[in-house]
Design a protein with these regions (language model features):
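Long, contiguous internal "core" modules enriched in hydrophobic/ aromatic residues
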Residues: 1-270
Length: 270
């Protein structure tokens, strides 16, 4: 019987997280897109590469030759992956993309149309390739706490973190035990949430930390306190239902013992 309760816990979690994750993905995309269009002063993908993506020629003055080469390689990899995404979308007859290639009035796909076909992983990689100034601009538009993020890496590191969970939800993989986790959180990723929310520690080893990161993003994205609190209550209800249905020793393995206290800290932060 225990397996059935676990299956229900996992399905209920995915159902709860899906809509909120899609909202976060779309909202962050819109903020990043707006910043890129303003900073490149253009909607051309080529202008984006030239003006807001880091490469050998616009690397920081302090960069070594090796660092400049790495930035250039990342830029080429980005161009490669964007071309592949466009080619795939065209092959699949995606109207968001074919419209621009099959229409004499257009010479290329605009940046905003590219954003419509980007996955969360693509978004994370693009953010990681942007110049420091543009990453700084996006971080500030989002109101991320940059005091513990001198290199402005949080905007893409957190997207990569959420992307692992998002893909697990989309592919109906198991989420309750965070086996989808592909990242090793940096000290800035931990420090930012500890400082902002007042948590004793953060490690992304339990689903609670992902709930915390999603709530932090919802707050940054101006979601109402009422809506975020309702989301937390629903999460608590799902975990409580599981806890009541199984043997306490089993529940203690699946549900982290300090989950309740962490959720209270989170609610006080809101």
């Amino acid at each position: 019987m225990g397996f059935l309760y676990l299956f229900k816990l996992d399905s209920d979690l995915k159902a709860l997280l899906y809509g909120k994750m899609m909202f976060i993905e779309t909202a962050v995309k819109n903020i990043a897109l707006e910043s890129i269009l303003v900073n490149a002063n253009s909607e051309s993908i080529q202008d984006m590469y030239d003006k807001v993506v880091s490469g050998y020629n616009n690397a920081p003055t302090s960069a070594t030759t090796e660092q400049k080469r790495k930035l250039q390689q990342n830029k080429l990899n980005l161009q490669n992956s964007i071309q592949s995404s466009l080619a795939y979308a065209y092959k699949k007859n995606n109207p968001k993309i074919t419209h621009f290639y099959n229409n004499i009035g257009y010479s290329d796909v605009p940046v905003w149309a590219l954003f419509e076909i980007m996955t969360m992983g693509d978004l994370g990689y693009l953010l990681s390739c942007l110049t420091y100034d543009v990453r700084d601009d996006i971080s500030k538009r989002l109101s991320l706490n940059v005091s513990c993020d001198t290199d402005r890496q949080l905007i893409y590191k957190y997207i990569y973190t959420l992307k692992d969970l998002r893909n697990a939800i989309a592919h109906n993989a198991v989420v309750f035990d965070t086996r989808f986790r592909n990242i090793d959180p940096t000290s800035a990723m931990k420090q930012c949430l500890k400082l902002e929310i007042g948590l004793p520690y953060v490690n992304f080893k339990t689903i609670g930390d992902y709930i915390i990161l999603m709530c932090y993003y919802m707050k940054l994205l101006k979601v109402s306190k009422t809506e975020i609190k309702a989301f937390i209550r629903e999460f608590e209800k799902i975990t409580d239902n599981y806890r009541q249905a199984v043997n306490p020793n089993v529940a203690a393995i699946v549900i982290h013992p300090d989950l309740a206290s962490r959720m209270n800290i989170l609610k006080n932060f809101l």
